[in-house]
Amino acid sequence: MPSLEKAVVLEFINLLAVAILILLTGFFVAVEFSIVKVRRSKIDQLVAKGKKGAKAAKHVITHLDEYLSACQLGITVAALGLGWLGEPTVQTLLRPLFHKAGLNESLTHLLSLVIAFLVVTYLNVVIGELAPKSFAIQKAESITLLFAKPLIWFYKIMFPFIWLLNHSARLITGVFGLKPASEHELAYTEEELRVLLAESYKSGEIRKSELKYMNNIFTFDKRMAKEIMVPRNEMVSLSLDEDSISNLQETVKQTKYTRYPVVREDKDNVIGVINMKEVLFSMLTKDFSIKKHQIEPFVQPVIHVIETIPIYKLLLKMQKERTHMAILIDEYGGTSGLVTVEDIIEEIVGEIRDEFDADEVPHIRELGKDHYLLNAKLLISDVNSLLGTDLSEAEVDTLGGWFLTQNIDAEPESAIEYDGYSFKVKDINSHHILFIEVKKAE
């Protein structure tokens, strides 16, 4: 065979080898990202259904560290081979072109070397890394099922080298007193999880309601009972000394609650709680008289807790005590309010409204763009989240309380501007602010 033909064949073989090395890089990159991204629960479902390749895929993702090492070895070997073979091959193809252009040998060598480096790098990054990575992230399940077996074969063939490299790395990290990192043992901060959830919502993986629930859970253990309580002045209570079942009937007609705290003398002495279901069942019996029966036989024990207790601890305590209501006390032992299980659950799922809440005004009522009617009991933290403001929570918990710290002579239509918003009192009962209108300051 003439020397020219040999050179052409050799160049063709070299180009083919370069293409194979780039494809191998793409293979290992795609497999690496797909086995990390794929959900183990989904693979378990496919194994149960007998899906082809599912068992191999499960084996790979349950031994993730070993197979990630195999992928990294494959990428490294392919990259070294590409550097060793790719640039000289492309450089050889370019040199005749520069010679024909009349360039001297030094300039020809320099230009062909630089261009060959750029071409090989471009092809390797685009075809060998970026494209496979994007494809693997979007089609993680399919790629894992398709390439799990080839990856297992590669791992078995290269096992001595992988074992040697892993143990060498462990020895080096051990010298510095470090434990070897495990790629699949990832821990995320709360903020990182919030970002991941937000991205999942934007991509359509989760619904808006699910995003809201998860974000509420993150703040759940930071909330104190006093932040969600029904304050003392709004508690509807029954007096053990004065109220009969007949009086109770009138109270229920007006307020429509299921449970009521029972007090002796005043609200600082809450002795129990009464459940209207028990009263109703008794009223259905023939010998029950509304006028004669007192409420004392129906009074059940109620728990008392400090108002600063975290709501997650309070929920656990209420579950343990099998009660739906807790009385909150302040540092001086006086009653500050009450909390029900419903109040706590609403911190996760949002406001729960039954058939008797039809006339109740929501805490947040949107009137227009950057224009709201807010319940004065709304927590300052919720107001800041809604408006993007920075109202101080140092002294008070609620929007109404904050307004009074800014204007102690608040009355209807009193207004202040703060942090780019106008806050105006729309409804007030004595010194108790009920609703505040908020809109973007002009």
From Swiss-Prot:
Provide the transmembrane region boundaries.
Answer: 16-36, 74-94, 110-130
What the entry lists under CDD domains is as follows: CBS_pair_CorC_HlyC_assoc
Q: How does it sit in the membrane?
A: Multi-pass membrane protein
Give the GO molecular function terms: flavin adenine dinucleotide binding
> Domain CBS: where?
229-290, 295-355
What pairs make up the disulfide bonds? none
Domain CNNM transmembrane positions: 7-210
Pfam families, alphabetized = CBS, CNNM, CorC_HlyC
Its localization reads: Cell membrane
Protein's recorded name: UPF0053 protein YqhB
Q: Report the gene name.
A: yqhB
